[in-house]
């Protein structure tokens, strides 16, 4: 568990504060992390809306929105930290800065984001070293993406760990859609 003095935690705290202030007045950002979130803000906000459809953006508490924006950026666009770390950190930030229901709201929304096709496709592209545009649902791993059996097996192991799920041993994975369907149905 990270301490309150952990530099990564402190950086996230500053980024949340930056994003909070930015939501009221688009001012100069002081952290690289917040700058990266804002560069991807349109896409991040689309995922925020999708993860909490019962709340329009303008109805989400600005503190919760700032935490969600940061965590969604880290989960979908940055992906340098394991998902569990990102979600745990976001929940901790919600406990520090948010209201009574903030931690459960943040945790629930981020749990949905983990399994979104947009994120799974980015993970597949990164793992296979393929262009994201080539990772369509119809793409055949071997024919279209030139993946070997070992690369496909490694990808499945990565996704199992990343998404806390288990692909059945008899599950035939031929296309990207096979993975997306399984993740959606699990």
Question: Residue spans of the language-model regions?
Answer:
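N-terminal interaction/assembly modules
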Residues: 1-103, 108-115, 122
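Conserved alpha-helix in the HATPase_c
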Residues: 154
């Amino acid at each position: 568990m990270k301490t309150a003095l952990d530099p990564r935690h402190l950086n996230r705290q500053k980024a949340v504060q930056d994003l909070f202030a930015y939501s009221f007045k688009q001012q100069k950002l002081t952290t690289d992390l917040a700058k990266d979130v804002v560069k991807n803000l349109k896409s991040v906000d689309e995922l925020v809306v999708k993860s909490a459809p019962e709340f329009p953006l303008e109805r989400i508490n600005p503190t919760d929105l700032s935490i969600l924006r940061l965590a969604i950026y880290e989960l979908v666009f940055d992906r340098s930290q394991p998902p569990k770390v990102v979600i745990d950190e976001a929940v901790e930030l919600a406990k520090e800065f948010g209201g009574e229901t903030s931690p459960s709201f943040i945790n629930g929304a981020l749990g949905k984001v983990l399994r979104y096709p947009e994120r799974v496709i980015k993970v597949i592209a990164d793992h296979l070293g393929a262009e994201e545009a080539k990772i369509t649902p119809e793409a055949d791993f071997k024919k279209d993406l030139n993946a070997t059996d070992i690369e496909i097996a490694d990808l499945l192991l990565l996704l199992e760990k990343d998404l806390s799920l288990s692909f059945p041993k008899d599950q035939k994975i031929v296309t990207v859609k096979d993975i997306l369907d399984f993740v959606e149905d699990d």
